[in-house]
């Protein structure tokens, strides 16, 4: 039987999904991050498949989303996008420490994955935590600074004035530089990393992520199988079942 528990640690709500017989055992941990305007329970199908394979799956609630949400228009929420991502990276560490303290992680076998904003978060977290043993980015991007600059350019092209002091913009830019994997690919340390991206994606651009993959392939020359990019020529911003199953398979192989 698969158990689903709604828990909270240090103010972070999350769903904890695991086989009943593994509830108090040390097993591999996979943290899966949801996308923008989504919520933790929207990825229960992925967590179920992970739990079936013997993993402990954890689905955190991102700041300003789901049960942490507020009455906020999408446009207003978008203004908090990078704060949400950077906060989520910090909270991933809190969750890891919790399960580690409880003795529920098997030998440091920890994986991280996410869709869209969750994929972006995953790639940033790889710059922060060397204990992440394997990662999967579904429709994500490592190019934090480039994406942020594109957002600013888009707003300005619409004739909209950015109601934020330039000093704060530059402060955020510096914070993003610290978590921009495209600026420090050596932090991957040849860890297993899978990308899935739809070529017709108009939300998170396909080309920059593909370019990053092509750039880092040389880092994996000794173990090329540990780096994979699946580009779906017919897909847009929606993860198909095949990509979900590949995610499960990736963690089965590398955790």
UniProtKB/Swiss-Prot annotation:
This is Putative esterase YitV. Keywords: Hydrolase. GO terms for molecular function: carboxylic ester hydrolase activity; serine-type peptidase activity. One of its GO terms (biological process) is proteolysis. The keyword Repeat does not apply. Its EC number is 3.1.-.-. The keyword Hydrolase applies. It comes from the Bacteria. SUPFAM superfamilies: alpha/beta-Hydrolases (SSF53474). Disulfide bonds: none annotated. It comes from Bacillus subtilis (strain 168).
């Amino acid at each position: 039987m698969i158990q689903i528990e709604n828990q909270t640690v240090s103010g972070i709500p999350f769903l904890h999904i695991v086989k009943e017989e593994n509830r108090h055992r040390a097993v591999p941990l996979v943290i899966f991050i949801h996308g923008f305007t989504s919520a933790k329970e929207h990825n229960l199908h992925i967590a179920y498949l992970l739990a079936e394979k013997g993993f402990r799956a954890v689905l955190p609630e991102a700041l300003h989303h789901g049960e942490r949400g507020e009455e906020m228009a999408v446009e207003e929420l978008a203004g908090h996008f990078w704060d949400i991502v950077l906060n989520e990276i910090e909270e991933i560490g809190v969750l890891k420490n919790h399960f580690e303290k409880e003795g529920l992680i098997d030998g440091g076998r920890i994986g991280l994955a996410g869709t869209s904003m969750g994929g972006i978060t995953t790639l940033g977290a790889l710059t922060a935590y060397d204990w992440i043993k394997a990662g999967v980015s579904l429709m994500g991007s490592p190019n934090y600074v480039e994406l942020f600059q594109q957002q600013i350019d888009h707003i300005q092209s619409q004739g909209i004035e950015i109601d934020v002091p330039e000093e704060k913009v530059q402060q955020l830019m510096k914070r993003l530089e610290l978590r921009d994997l495209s600026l420090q690919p050596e932090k991957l340390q040849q860890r297993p990393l899978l990308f899935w991206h739809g070529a017709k994606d108009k939300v998170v651009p396909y080309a920059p992520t593909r370019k990053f993959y092509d750039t880092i392939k040389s880092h994996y020359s000794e173990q090329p199988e540990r780096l994979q990019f699946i580009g779906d020529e017919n897909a847009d911003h929606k993860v198909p079942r095949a990509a979900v199953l590949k995610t499960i398979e990736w963690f089965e192989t590398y955790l």
